């Protein structure tokens, strides 16, 4: 009996540990085990903006509102008495949650965020200047000031007289080999960032600095930490980071102060948000500030660069990013520039940083004065380009302004790289203000210069002939080339997404032991449904892996063109034993390639511990791109065979006969000649797609003709859907659709209701906010945010835990609502719950039935039981579990030290022998299952 209790206790403890640590981001805590920090504020969301209602709700709960709302309808609430007990505060929040006007409420906890510079002894030149904080209101005068037309472009006289300009080696050929970022070529065409607004998200900026004051933009500035409009940082000796970044972008030129900013005529603002506790809501409020006014947001911070953290933006920050690219700048999209990270000395990777792996950001790396990688550089395939920065104290760093009112030549790290990139991007926006956020990503990577950095190892040529590196992206940003290409750039076609989910053969999840290598292949043919992606932009891999030491894992992706991207290198400092859950790894290295063909994901371990165990669960390939070339001069890929045959048969049909419903007989008409390419059989007007006798490909109804006219097209335009050989109009609330009233994508930042399995909802409708019972999903599809049924956030085999993240169901459950066997909705294969109410193993066929197993030969009546009963029973079970766990915790260390080997019943998978290159298949004999999803190869051959 003692042995049985001990075994049960250990099983319970294992479940509790799994529940506690199965999380998406390392910063997400589990309050049930006391792992959370004290909440710093509470956020509520109302149905629409109503400041007076928000204040009344707060007052009724002995709280108060601070600052302006963010994301339109979200408000910061603070408890009136900070000495209240935690239990009292929680009770207030629970009452808030039940208020009929409150759609959502959450206590916000601090997240660890660090500035991406490092400390050198500053040789600063300080000027006497008062360092003050005063509130500056945003008024109509300020707004009108920015809207006034600027004077014509003036060609500056170089070199500038500013005293430290001579030390800005990265701007005038001062790097080894005479290299720089070719900014002077843009300046000499008169571009200096006019009419472009840049906001520095950081610890604030000194708005009255003599080298910034004339360019200061109050509409691009605020204080989220203290909830006022003045971004001036506290003068405590530490808060100089944001001011330094601002000076790199827009320090004045020709005023004999410090050096010059890259975009010295741009408007510069700052958000004070790092000078206090940082939460998801603080980040969201910063990222969503005045998105129609601000053009570029520059951020030189992120999760800890310690080599052991996986973390990224929370749900509110992700929504802010999404709204920015959808609605910002009048629908052209805000441009988010991010520093790639300073964890190189700890062998960190920016692939573990959810800000740099966001599709919406331009991740910027660094290079040194002598064109090498700096010691702090992090590698990842999401880095798009590089600027110069610092190395060590023996080499020159970056010149900029400093607080209070001085200058420095010691600005460092990738913190210095992101603002330089933002300034150069501002030059391109002045040259072409119509550029979208995706246009800018195209331009930056197409014009980047890899030649100054070519002597660094790791460069490779991708499938379209561009050189790319995990260290430097596509190379140094080239200001002159960027501006020149921007001037003639045409807006890229709409971005689409294709999703391919890998189906893992049994055993699922797949046990992994020791040093292993798994190779999974996916065959891609454009898109299984919807608009095809033939010209790649971003590539994402969402993967779930559990392993004893997360830092021993390595993930590599191979495209059909042979481009190899190391999505995750080994990180020796990362001893996390929980792996990662659906982490969005990003690569921009396949940009421009044709995605069709076989993709291969290699998952391997570099461990030296043969007893290291884990499980591989799932992976999904997300391909972002367009159906047409981005620019007219780009290579044109052939259409898929299936599509070509379909189009060909349609042409033959139109050529051979006229539809019965056609109101005219085409042979009776005389063709005008020189018909449009889409015409078939003649036309009544030359070169007009609306005057054809018949169409080669598709007939599209004209919206402005009330549906009575048509034009011939090769494919349906946006706001139309394909029905046979006709393009019919979508409903006016759709951007694209699959049927007239079933939207596929929505205009602006509207949310798409995607609940086809729940017909009582308006599936396919575009809405401003999700109806009750549905939740907004900004993560699964970055092209179109959706309203989904809450369970769909995770999928089969997972449930939503207490902190809103996906956790694994118990192994006995195929689907579940909570942890443990008591919460199964449907039992796994080989389990049943027909007689006892929870899933347990089926009795062997022909064996004597006993209380230890389930008679699975009988139908399961519990499938019809109300889920509320099951949930209540499950709650009782977990109360008992907690008591047993508390009793068994004392023996935890002793038992753990005695338990050395794995208790996984599956035979070990293939292991790679690094000494002789052999692949050891161990005792695995089920070759048929292996062939379904794995091809074991010698990595030296690959």
Swiss-Prot record:
User: Which residues face the membrane's Cytoplasmic side?
Assistant: 893-942
**Can you say where the FU repeats lie in this chain?**
674-723, 725-777, 804-850
Mention one GO molecular function.
serine-type endopeptidase activity
The positions annotated for binding Ca(2+) 3 are 305, 348, 378
Tissue and organ distribution: In larvae and adults, expressed in all hypodermal cells, vulva and ventral nerve cords.
Q: Which residues form a coiled coil?
A: none
Q: What happens when the gene is disrupted?
A: RNAi-mediated knockdown causes an arrest at the L1 developmental stage. RNAi-mediated knockdown in ASEL neuron results in a severe reduction in Ca(2+) signal in ASEL neuron and in chemotaxis in response to high salt concentrations.
Q: Which residues form the signal peptide?
A: 1-22
Topology of this chain in the membrane: Single-pass type I membrane protein
* Enzyme nomenclature, EC number: 3.4.21.-
Tell me which residues bind Ca(2+) 1: 124, 211, 252, 255, 257, 259
Cofactor: how and how many bound: Binds 3 calcium ions per subunit.
What biological-process terms (Gene Ontology) are attached? Answer: cellular response to salt; chemosensory behavior; collagen and cuticulin-based cuticle development; positive regulation of synaptic assembly at neuromuscular junction; protein processing
Propeptide positions: 23-116
Q: Where is the active site?
A: 202 (charge relay system), 241 (charge relay system), 415 (charge relay system)
Q: Where is the P/Homo B domain?
A: 491-629
Record-linked PANTHER family = FURIN-LIKE PROTEASE 2, PROPROTEIN CONVERTASE SUBTILISIN/KEXIN-RELATED
Question: Which family is annotated?
Answer: Belongs to the peptidase S8 family. Furin subfamily.
Q: What is this protein called?
A: Endoprotease bli-4
- Provide the species name: Caenorhabditis elegans
The organism's lineage is: Eukaryota, Metazoa, Ecdysozoa, Nematoda, Chromadorea
């Amino acid at each position: 009996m003692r042995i049985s209790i001990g075994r049960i206790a250990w099983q319970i403890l294992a479940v509790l540990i799994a529940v506690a640590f199965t999380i998406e981001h390392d910063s997400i805590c589990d309050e049930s085990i006391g792992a959370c920090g004290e909440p710093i504020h509470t956020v509520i969301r109302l149905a629409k903006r109503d400041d007076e209602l928000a204040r009344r709700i707060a007052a009724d709960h002995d709280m108060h509102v601070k600052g302006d709302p963010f994301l339109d309808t979200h408000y910061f609430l603070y408890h009136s008495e900070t000495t209240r007990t935690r239990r009292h505060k929680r009770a207030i929040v629970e009452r808030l949650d039940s208020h009929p006007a409150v759609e959502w409420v959450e206590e916000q906890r601090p997240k660890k965020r660090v500035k991406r510079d490092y400390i050198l002894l500053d040789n600063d030149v300080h000027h006497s200047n008062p360092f003050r904080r005063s509130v500056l209101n945003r008024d109509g005068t300020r707004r009108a000031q920015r809207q006034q037309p600027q004077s014509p472009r003036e060609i500056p006289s170089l070199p500038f007289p500013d005293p430290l300009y001579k030390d800005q080696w990265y701007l005038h050929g001062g790097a080894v080999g005479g290299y720089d970022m070719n900014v002077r070529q843009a300046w000499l065409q008169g571009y200096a960032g006019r009419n472009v607004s840049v906001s520095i998200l950081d610890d604030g900026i000194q708005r009255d600095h003599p080298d910034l004051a004339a360019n200061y933009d109050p509409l691009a500035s605020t204080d989220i930490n203290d909830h006022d409009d003045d971004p001036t940082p506290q003068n405590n000796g530490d808060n100089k980071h944001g001011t330094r970044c601002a000076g790199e972008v827009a320090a004045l030129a020709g005023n004999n102060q410090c050096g010059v900013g890259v975009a010295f005529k741009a408007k510069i603002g700052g958000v004070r948000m790092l000078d206090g506790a940082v939460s998801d809501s603080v980040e969201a409020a910063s990222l969503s500030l005045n998105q129609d006014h601000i053009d570029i947001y520059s951020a030189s911070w992120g999760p800890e660069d310690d080599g052991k953290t996986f973390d990224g933006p929370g749900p509110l920050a992700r929504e802010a990013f999404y709204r920015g690219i959808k609605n910002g700048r009048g629908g052209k999209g805000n441009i988010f520039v991010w520093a790639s990270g300073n964890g190189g000395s700890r062998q960190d990777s920016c692939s573990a940083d959810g800000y740099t792996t966001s599709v919406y950001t331009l991740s910027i790396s660094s290079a040194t004065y002598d064109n090498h990688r700096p010691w702090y550089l992090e590698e990842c395939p999401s880095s798009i380009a590089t600027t110069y920065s610092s190395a060590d104290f023996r080499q020159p760093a970056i010149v900029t302004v400093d607080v209070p009112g001085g200058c420095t030549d010691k600005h460092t790290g990738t913190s210095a790289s992101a603002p330089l990139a933002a300034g150069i991007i501002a030059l391109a926006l002045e040259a072409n203000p119509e550029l979208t956020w995706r246009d800018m990503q195209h331009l930056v990577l197409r014009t980047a210069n890899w030649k100054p950095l070519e002597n660094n190892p790791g460069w490779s040529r991708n499938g379209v002939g561009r050189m790319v590196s995990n260290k430097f992206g596509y190379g140094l940003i080239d200001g002159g080339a960027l501006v020149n290409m921007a001037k003639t750039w045409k807006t890229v076609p709409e971005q689409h997404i294709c999703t391919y989910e890998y189906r893992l053969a049994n055993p699922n999840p797949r046990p992994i032991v020791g040093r292993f290598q798994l190779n999974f292949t996916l065959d891609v043919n454009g898109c299984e449904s919807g608009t095809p992606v033939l010209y790649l932009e971003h590539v994402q891999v969402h993967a779930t892996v559990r392993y004893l030491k997360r830092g021993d894992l390595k993930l590599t992706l191979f495209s059909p063109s042979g481009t190899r991207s190391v999505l995750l290198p080994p990180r020796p400092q990362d001893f996390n034993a929980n792996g990662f859950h659906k982490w969005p790894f990003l690569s921009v290295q396949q940009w421009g390639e044709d995605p069709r063909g076989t993709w291969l994901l290699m998952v391997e371990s570099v461990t030296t511990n043969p007893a290291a165990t884990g499980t591989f669960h799932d992976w999904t390939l997300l391909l972002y791109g367009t159906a047409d070339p981005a620019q007219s001069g780009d290579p044109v890929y052939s259409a898929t065979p299936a599509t070509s045959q379909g189009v060909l048969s349609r042409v033959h049909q139109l050529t051979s006969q006229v539809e019965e419903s056609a109101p005219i007989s085409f042979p009776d008409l005389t063709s005008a000649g020189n018909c449009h390419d889409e015409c078939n059989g003649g036309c009544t007007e030359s070169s007009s797609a609306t005057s054809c006798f018949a169409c080669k490909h598709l007939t599209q109804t004209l919206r402005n003709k009330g549906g009575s006219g048509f034009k011939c097209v090769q494919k349906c335009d946006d706001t139309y859907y394909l029905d046979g050989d006709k393009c019919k109009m979508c409903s006016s609330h759709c951007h694209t659709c699959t049927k007239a009233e079933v939207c596929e994508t929505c205009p602006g930042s509207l949310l798409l209701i995607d609940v086809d399995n729940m017909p009582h909802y308006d599936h396919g409708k575009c809405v401003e906010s999700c109806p009750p019972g549905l939740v907004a999903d900004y993560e699964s599809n970055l092209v179109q945010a959706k309203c989904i049924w809450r369970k769909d956030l995770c999928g089969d085999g997972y449930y939503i835990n207490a902190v809103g993240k996906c956790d694994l169901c118990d192994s006995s459950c195929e689907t579940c609502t909570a942890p443990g066997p008591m919460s199964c909705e449907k039992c796994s294969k080989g389990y049943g719950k027909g007689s006892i109410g929870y899933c347990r193993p089926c009795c062997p066929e022909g064996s004597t039935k006993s209380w230890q197993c389930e008679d699975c030969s009988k139908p399961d009546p519990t499938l019809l039981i109300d889920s509320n009963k099951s949930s209540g029973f499950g709650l009782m079970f977990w109360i008992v579990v907690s008591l047993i766990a508390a009793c068994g915790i004392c023996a935890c260390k002793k038992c753990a030290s005695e338990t050395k080997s794995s208790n996984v019943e599956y035979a070990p998978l293939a292991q790679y022998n690094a000494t002789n290159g052999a692949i050891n298949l161990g005792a695995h004999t089920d070759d048929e299952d292996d062939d379904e999803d794995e091809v074991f190869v010698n990595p030296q051959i690959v």
